[in-house]
Amino acid sequence: MEVLAKHRFARTSPQKCRLVADQIRGLPVAKALEILTFSPKKAAVLVKKVLDSAIANAEHNEGADIDELRVGAIMIDEGPTMKRIMPRAKGRADRIIKRTSHITVVVSDR
């Protein structure tokens, strides 16, 4: 049994979010939640929210036992980028790219 939860258009770069995702991939959900709770990174808060949602989906929709769940897969895909302009000296302008992520967490009982 596999249950997933998604957070699309998360306002963090995929590169930063993958650092957090790599730490919890394949772990039991209790251990993963513990790691995310004490992580100082902003992306950890976003990933923890999605993991909590996946656990709730498994419990409510499938009747799964929380103690047996593991983080089966966690994928961080690149979302659309927002282009912004930063004024610079002598009438020039630089482009700022604000990146977004699509966070997908799959929990399974295997």
UniProtKB/Swiss-Prot annotation:
Gene Ontology CC terms, in alphabetical order: cytosolic large ribosomal subunit
Molecular function terms from GO: rRNA binding; structural constituent of ribosome
One Pfam match: Ribosomal_L22
InterPro entries assigned: Ribosomal_uL22, Ribosomal_uL22_bac/chlpt-type, Ribosomal_uL22_bac/org-type, Ribosomal_uL22_CS, Ribosomal_uL22_sf
SUPFAM superfamilies: Ribosomal protein L22 (SSF54843)
Subunit structure, as described in the record: Part of the 50S ribosomal subunit.
Purpose: This protein binds specifically to 23S rRNA; its binding is stimulated by other ribosomal proteins, e.g. L4, L17, and L20. It is important during the early stages of 50S assembly. It makes multiple contacts with different domains of the 23S rRNA in the assembled 50S subunit and ribosome. The globular domain of the protein is located near the polypeptide exit tunnel on the outside of the subunit, while an extended beta-hairpin is found that lines the wall of the exit tunnel in the center of the 70S ribosome.
HAMAP family per UniProt: Ribosomal_uL22_B
Protein name: Large ribosomal subunit protein uL22
Originating organism: Shewanella sediminis (strain HAW-EB3)
